[in-house]
Amino acid sequence: MRLCSFTLPGELPDMLRAGVVEGPLVFELKKRTSIMAIIQSGVAPNSLETDTGGHELDNVLLGPPVQRPLKILATIVNTQGMLGGKDVMLDRPRLDMKAPSTVVGPGAGIHVPGSGIRPEVELAMYVGRRLSAATTAQAEAGIFGYTVLNDVTAPADSREDAYEAYRRDRATGEIRKTLLRGPLFRSKNHDGFCPMGPWVVTSDENDWSDLKMTTKFGDLLVQDGSTSEYIFSPAKIASYVSKFLTLEPGDVVSCGSVGWTSEALGELDPTEFVLPMKEGTLELEIEGVGRLTNPLVVGRQ
């Protein structure tokens, strides 16, 4: 089942309705509610009743499935393409946080800072049950559904936020001044840096384990990979997080991105990659989940 949040023409953006997407139509739920309320209530999605008359998807404005998740955890690296080498392995997920207020929906403009941005297509899960010290099986059963998340990043911010500190050299044991990479928080938390959508696909709908993931910017293929590249499954990530931080219904956990294409990178190091500084439309797609499109806004706020 595909559940979406939407408004009709002329309605305010925050007056979101909840509906079920079937083909080219969206059917509003009979009971006025939100996807967040549905997730938190624990009601079975297939028990939801809809109106008989549907709206054409092209005639509604889709919002993010959940306008303000309780918290958003983003897996930083979960594929070899993001690690930069096949000889690198991880023993556990690495994560960061995105502010819930950075969430926007399909079609919302992404304002590009002067240093540029890069997109990161990610499969994101909505947590459907309270998870605390959960096993992988318990975490799997606690996933409500999946959506597409763009973990927009301004990499220059973390370079600017680098700082020096005294650290012990692992090889020599000597304590010396070391330049440390800056935190990722600022680079990932500008307003609008977390587009999500176009809807949430309930976890019973399909198998997440081998879904094609792509990002396009106009005619440029920026990312091309698959969820089969994930080192840690969504359930393993959720289980790991729940060992130290309780996950609540309505939380979002994003599972990581894939590497950038050689066509997009050119001669750039992956850590330096940003999109060309021009306006255009980003199109992120995960097979079986959906296509998320957002225009880039350059040079104006």
Task: Spell out what each predicted region is.
Residues 43-64, 68, 162, 170-180, ...:
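A short, charged
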Residues 233-277:
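A conserved acidic, glycine/proline-rich C-terminal tail/linker
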Residues 1, 5-21, 111, 116, ...:
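Charged, cofactor-coupling segments
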Residues 64-65, 71, 115-117, 239, ...:
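Residue "hotspots" at secondary-structure boundaries inside conserved domains
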Residues 72-229, 233-237:
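Glycine-enriched loop-and-adjacent helix/strand subsegments that border the catalytic/binding cleft
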Residues 1-94, 100-101, 114, 214, ...:
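N-terminal non-catalytic cap/leader segment that marks the start of a structured domain
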Residues 32, 227-228, 298:
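Residue-level structural signal for beta-strand termini and adjacent loop
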